[in-house]
Each structure stands twice: as structure tokens, then as C-alpha cells.
């Protein structure tokens, strides 16, 4: 959705992303104007089940109370899961209190622990884990990782009298064994290996740090901030941000599949130099452009 840094500029908005995993929609960060972008790109607010806030700099969460208020206005009743840094709950409570707003729905808030990795969310398909960024205030990255998939059943090979419970065992990778220990159906005879589980890592505001490599190693898709070009590396270090080449260096060292660049400084109207700089280090680098999809599997 949004890909700019501190302020909107050059038809680029502040940070926000929608990640769809199966039928689950996750909003990652919520900069100013996010709800307008969701409407523009036809993402129904009712589909958003979880929101993840990386840190409490305004360009990453100033759109949150407006989005929550609109969800209320539209009659939402389903609970909203909200994950963010310490202090986010207090901010939301104050905003609702002083606007005399009593929401139609519950906010299930969990504030993550700064400086450590922890699992925030888990369902039968994926889990979502935090990992620390190196920024001026408490800031977290998020790893979205698909759980190992079950074996693919070769339906054409299944006996007609096999039971559903026995098929379930084969999917789990188990041989089907009767009460006396005899193998009735060998898993390898009736199944094929599933595709590789997919993963996405979101690296919000951070200076260059290799401490994150263990958390993002070999992910299929990596988003990493690229606020500056390399000629402003000193400025990047001073403000706890990264350059495009530094983001690409992290992608290369972590052996990721593809890199999305974002969080661009307002000083850059033309982003071609940002992309060129990154691709000199890591070929599979791409600009985070509003409305553009990065699809890992159809």
C-alpha cells in the first residue's frame, strides 16, 4: 500500500502492507491514509483479521485510530486482533476515551516484548514471529511462515476400500498399520511430497544489522527498508535507517528469494537510482509500489 518514509510525497503514501495467506488478511503497519488506500484497492475492511504495528513512529501507525473508527462506523462486530509495541494500548484507549467512542467490537491487543523474538500469532496454516530491529525506539520485524504442508495424496492409486481415517494418516506421512503391526498401506506408495512451505519477512525501520540474518534466512520474500542511497550512508546510520545497497546486502547474505525495497525518503522523487543501487548487490530486488502484488503461489 504505502511505501514512503516520514511524510507522503510524490504520490507515495506512508507505510502499510496487506498480506493475504489463504483466506486470512493481515495488515502490517498503518500509516496515515491507509484506510483510503484499502478502499482504493478494494480491500474490504471486514476481511482484516489482524493488524501488526512495528513501532510507534507516526508514519507507521497514525492511520490506525481512523481505520478502527471506520470499522466501528461500518458496523463491525468481529473481534480485531492487534499486535504492537508497549504503549500502543494506552494510545488507543486515550483516543477512544476522549472521543467518547464505545466500539461495537472487541480489540484483542497483545503488546510484543522489545528486544526478543516471540510467536505472536498461530493458526493451523501459519505462525507469525517477531524479531528485533535496530532503531531509535523499540521496533520489531515480523516473520510470516507457513507451517509444513501435508503429503499430497495420489488419489488414482488409492484402494476403493481405504478409510478416511487411513487417508488422514497417509497425509501426515505415516504408514497405515493394523492392530497386529502389519503395514496395510505404505505412505510412500500413495503420496507425493508437498510443495515447499513459504515465508515472508518484514523488516521495518532499522539501521544495517546482521543480527536479523538468523530470523530471515532463506525466506521466499523479504521486505527491507531502504530510506537512503549509499551516498547518504552516514545519515542512514545517524537516523537508524538503511540504504538501498545495505538492504540488498542483507538479502544476499540471508539468501532470500526476492527483496522488496520501501520506506523511501521524500528527497527521492525518482526511485530508479534506488532500484539500480540495490540490483548491483542483489539482482532480485524490486521497488515496493502502491497497489503492486507480489504473489508467491497462485
Task: Kindly label every feature range from the protein language model.
Residues 1, 115-122:
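Local beta-strand/beta-hairpin segments that build beta-sheet-rich folds
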Residues 173-293:
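Cap/insert and terminal regions of metallo-dependent hydrolase folds
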Residues 1-41, 47, 79, 142-144, ...:
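Conserved beta-strand hairpin/beta-sheet module of binuclear metal-dependent hydrolase folds
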Residues 32-83, 111-113:
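Active-site metal-binding motif and surrounding structural segment of the metallo-beta-lactamase
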Residues 76-113, 267:
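Active-site neighborhood of divalent metal-dependent phosphoester bond hydrolases
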